[in-house]
Amino acid sequence: MLGSPEATPSTGTARASALPPPVPPGGWSTEPRPAPAEIDVFGLTDSGRVRRENQDHFLIASLHKLLRVHQSSIPPDDLTPLVTESRGFVFLVADGVGGRPDGAQASGTVIRAIAHYVTHLTDLYRRLDPDRESEFLAQLERAVLETHDLLLKEGLREYGGKGGATTLTMLFALWPRAYVVHLGDSGCFRLREGRLERMTRDQTVAEALVRAGALRPSEARQSPFGNVLASALGGPEATPLTLATDARRDDIVLLCTDGLTKHVTEDEIAGRLRTLQSSEQVCRDLVSLANERGGTDNVTVLVGRIRPASR
């Protein structure tokens, strides 16, 4: 559900403050990039126990340089490999807004559009350094806002106005840094040194009231405004929150839609991540737990980590 349904669609920008300030440029890690065999990522989505349609979509992709050969006199086997090792990963999760037409189409459109934009950022993230970090974040933000405009145009064309809308939470893992872009009430978490950190904040009317001092956090959890989005792609307002932070080898990241956090507490999420054996196992466990407790919404969970060195 979106707030201010009669408001004029607009775009804007903001900087997230969910985590401490990023490491200064001189503090960039010089530790080697993890090898592909060390990376363990997995994503899972489920319609839940109540909803007929799954309006969640997600994507996990590794980032490479690629040479596409159209013709050659050289045997194909002699030309491999033509894809470089991964330079990083991108995680995307989008939750179509209920109560609006084509929530599933909106979330799918956003995933496809952002994936398309990412392919055109190759040169920028390949040469990423402290001096270009702000430019990179600005490019990500621009891609998100252009996708917002795309959804508005689709809504005008298909429905004469109010079309589909969706949340979006995106994590770029580009060693030794991580970048988050966020709209709505999906979420991104990081387990570091055994402590769970929320890297995003919900963009709901209830959360805005809490920040304004008009509502206590305990009241927000029960408030009907807790399900009313103050910001979403394709909605009346789209205000991306962006964050740059450091990445460490012992980090575990988790992205999810609110179908998980409606039924599973942050303490429980932290407990599962602390005892993680594989990204797939923890995704399946958390989705199952949400469904066991009612599964009132679609639920999507993405997890990524660097495997610990074998002893």
Feature-to-residue mapping (PLM):
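PP2C/PPM-type serine/threonine phosphatase catalytic domain
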Residues: 1-311
